Amino acid sequence: ECELNSDYDVLALESLPDDYLPRTNYVPICDEAEYARRTPNVPWNAHLPVTRFSRLAFRRQLSQSGERTLISSILPPGFGHINTVNSLTFRKSNAAVGFASFCTSVVFDFFCKSTGRADAYESFLRELVFPLERLTPASFARTLALNCLTTHYAELWRECWNEAFRTETW
């Protein structure tokens, strides 16, 4: 159980179960139906909640004095988050993974640091331009391998799979 912000689990990737989920103290204060009602829908379909898609989540506070400024993670479908996190939903899974790849780059991080902004609200995140067509299969393979380790990401792997991944080396 988490009681302090310093309470972390030491994890060995080799021994984690395939369906591992990190622990959390977050519990919605409403029932499941109300939570679903409060969940926003994607802009391209008023009947699909954002939680039906893999999303790219960002720590809202930009760490201007830290080693990394823009901190992001890929959320699998079905997961929500608290208001200190912002997330973007993409129509196509490869766009989400591609944007995640750019967000881990030194170039994007430097840009975010150079703005001096304290928070990464959705309007700021939408300013970040990413030329998806310039990414190589290696970028996609590495982003998926570093972010999507459990069965919760199986659908994302299927949607983004490229046979070129088989020839990638580290």
Where do the language-model regions lie?
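S-adenosyl-L-methionine
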Residues: 1-170
